[in-house]
Amino acid sequence: MDEQQWTGQLDLTVFFDGNRSVSRDIFFEKALKVIRPVYLNQSTIPTFYIVNVGGGYLDGDRYRMNVNVEDNAKVTLTSQGATKIYKTPSNHVEQYQTFNLKDNAYLEYVADPIIAYENAKFYQHNTFNLNNSSSLFYTDILTPGYSKTGEAFKYQYMHLINEIYIEDELVTYDNLLLNPNKQSINEIGYMEHYSHYGSAYFIHEDVNQKLIDSVYETISSYSNTFDCRVAISQLPTHGFAVRIFAYRTQIIEKILGIIQSYIAENIYDRKLDFLRKY
């Protein structure tokens, strides 16, 4: 796509300098920007806050982001606020995100919710390129925005595609389409009367069935405590996926945070850093 057609674009490379992970080759323009990295609690892992300076995604907007994590580097990415998709009467909003992880690299991407308002159309395509020793933790939260009638599913559609490659081999293709006009969103097989959706991927060489069972034991009790549905499944590689249905964003954020904290403590032997957004 011609660069002039992007509403916002961002390129970021992180490498390990022998002491800590640092950034280089940062480029952003128009509606996307990245804030100078911070090292929370004297961590060696930089945290980058990605910002949409326009405040929301509008009709026909197109965004592109490319992140490279070099050998032995680690990075945390997050957003500064929710991604708000307003009504798109003519053209849907498109977002393309590519993540390239080299040997022993680790990417932690924990974004705020994607909120689709009445008559919104949103398409997101993520591509993850990993090596055998690369690691990834990635989350998404989908939330219905305000509508005049108060109904939850008044957006036109939300279409999210995630492709995960390891050593150039496609190991996971996740194609999620929520289209209230053509699907019975509240029925079994879709949202099952819940209004909010959350998901996570974790890929690491140490992932096995024992670890997956342990993660599930950590989060399974929340299904009754918060009236939500939680499921975890092994990916066709050394990783797992988590799905959550709930009625509130905060419930999904809490469960995903527990999973992220479990991974930080049990895989990386570190405490999870509070992102200090507010």
UniProtKB/Swiss-Prot annotation:
Localization per record: Cytoplasm
Sorted UniProt keywords: Chaperone, Cytoplasm, Nickel insertion
Cellular component, GO annotation: cytoplasm
Predominant localisation class: cytoplasm
Cysteines engaged in disulfide bonds, as pairs: none
A Pfam family hit: UreD
InterPro entries in the cross-refs: UreD
One GO MF term attached to the UniProt entry: nickel cation binding
Superkingdom of source: Bacteria
Function statement: Required for maturation of urease via the functional incorporation of the urease nickel metallocenter.
Assigned protein family: Belongs to the UreD family.
PANTHER family assigned: UREASE ACCESSORY PROTEIN D
Assembly mode: UreD, UreF and UreG form a complex that acts as a GTP-hydrolysis-dependent molecular chaperone, activating the urease apoprotein by helping to assemble the nickel containing metallocenter of UreC. The UreE protein probably delivers the nickel.
Protein name as catalogued: Urease accessory protein UreD
Top-level taxonomy: Bacteria, Bacillati, Bacillota, Bacilli, Bacillales
Gene symbol of the encoding locus: ureD
